[in-house]
Every structure is written in C-alpha cells, then in structure tokens.
Design a protein with these regions (language model features):
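Positively charged n-region of N-terminal signal peptides that target proteins for export
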Residues: 1-9
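Bacterial N-terminal signal peptides
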Residues: 8-16
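Bacterial lipoprotein signal-peptidase II cleavage site
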Residues: 16-34
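A short, well-structured beta->alpha microelement
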Residues: 105-126
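A short, gly/pro- and small-residue-rich
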Residues: 142-165, 214-221
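Structural recognition of alpha->loop->beta junctions
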Residues: 181-212
Length: 240
C-alpha cells in the first residue's frame, strides 16, 4: 500500500512540474529580435525600387582614389564660371541623398538656390544651373506617393526641358554602391548625357562606370570619400 501511495505521489509531482513548465513557456515574452532576413529588409533601401539589380551583400574589391586621408579626387578640371545662379537642386529617384545635398548647399553657404525634390519640367526655365541627385529608393518613392514609372516619366520630361533651355547640369550620385541598380543607373544615364560636371561618392564606382564616362565624354569628375566631403567642393564651386 505504501509503495502504491509513493508511486501516485511521484506521478502527481512529475505532472505538476510539466504543467508549470508549459505555463512558463506560454507566458514567456516573445523575442524582440527579428530574423536576419526581416532585419535586412528594414534597414536596406533598394537602389531601384521593386526590381533589384545590385546585391548590397556582394562585396566587390576595387582600388579607390579617396580615403580617410585623401577626401576628394578629381578627374579633369571643372570650370566654376559655367555654373551660375539661380540654382535648382532636384532628385531623380527620390532617395534621401537629395536632402543631404540640400544640407550640403546650406552648410556651404550657397545662397541663390532652390530645393525641390519633385520639381517639374516647367520649373527648369527659371534656373541657370540644375543639380540632379540620382539614386532611386523604394522608400522615397513610396513616401512621395509615386511609382517607378511616374518618376521615370518626370525625369524624361525634365530632360526634355533641359535640352530646350540648356542650363548647366551637375550630376550628383551620393548614395554609394547602395544607389546602383537598374532604375538608378537608368536615371543617372539620362543626366550623364548633358552633365557638365559629376560629383560621386566613390564606392559607387565599383564597376568603373563613372571613371569611364568621365574619360569618354570629357566630363570633369570629383570623387568624394563621404557625402560630407561635398561641402568643400560646392563651397569652392559656388562661392567664387
């Protein structure tokens, strides 16, 4: 009889422990860290909207001319007299890089310029210099409420207006390799057809694209090690 009672007590004890463990598992707070794939999606903005042609995780080794010690590097010589006020800063691709360009202009002390990321073709006639910041962002396009097709059409209309009124055009590519891709490159190539100067954060040149264009089209090019290095470049260009 004592053995039976002992066995029953042991069974009850084990059952109680199992129930307690199950309750703890049910009430334990969920982990706050998302899976790696979800984290990458939140922190990575596609360089070209919904169809990605550049893998940000694929590292490409290439020799850079800029560094921590050498902040800028020039190919060719820019003529500041070509770039007169009034100046327009706009975007092809609606990336946050355009707002960074606005900050550069302000901190460089440039006075007579307007910032309008969504400028229209009808605005172009009012400016002697147009700075176009190239680099598409799905997040930026979504925030602006426009599609890739809409942005491409806007860019094409602006380019038609530029060909009519002939302002001096500066192509800026400030987002580095993350702003390379099918749509980003398509928008950039539009601007390179008429650009008189290029300013590029150098790690976007992983395939030699911008160096090749500069040499083939004889367009002055300044490489930046980081976006902030653009302040000295644009201060020298416009505060003459």
């Amino acid at each position: 009889m004592k053995k039976i009672i002992a066995i029953l007590l042991a069974v009850l004890f084990v059952t109680a422990l199992a129930a307690c463990g199950s309750k703890t598992a049910e009430t334990a707070p969920a982990a706050t860290q998302a899976p790696a794939a979800e984290q990458k999606q939140e922190t990575y903005t596609s360089s070209q909207g919904t169809v990605d042609g550049f893998d940000p995780n694929q590292k490409t080794e290439f020799a850079m001319n800029t560094s921590e010690e050498v902040r800028t590097f020039n190919i060719g010589e820019v003529d500041p007299s070509l770039f007169e006020a009034p100046i327009l800063v706009t975007s092809f691709g609606q990336s946050a890089d355009t707002s960074m360009m606005d900050a550069i202009m302000k901190r460089s002390g440039v006075k007579d310029y307007a910032f309008n990321a969504l400028a229209k073709d009808t605005d172009i006639k009012n400016y002697k210099t147009v700075i176009i910041v190239c680099g598409a962002s799905s997040k930026g396009l979504g925030a602006a409420g426009i599609s890739e097709a809409d942005e491409t059409a806007r860019a094409e209309k602006i380019m038609a207006a530029i060909n009519e009124t002939n302002p001096a055009v500066i192509m800026c590519h400030l987002g580095g390799s993350m702003r390379r891709g099918v749509l980003s490159d398509k928008l950039t190539d539009m601007v390179l057809e008429v650009a008189k100067y290029m300013v590029v954060v150098e790690d976007a040149n992983f395939d030699g694209k911008f160096t090749t264009v500069a040499q083939e089209k004889n367009i002055p090019l300044t490489y930046l090690y980081a976006i902030k290095d653009g302040m000295d470049v644009f201060s020298a260009l416009f505060n003459k």
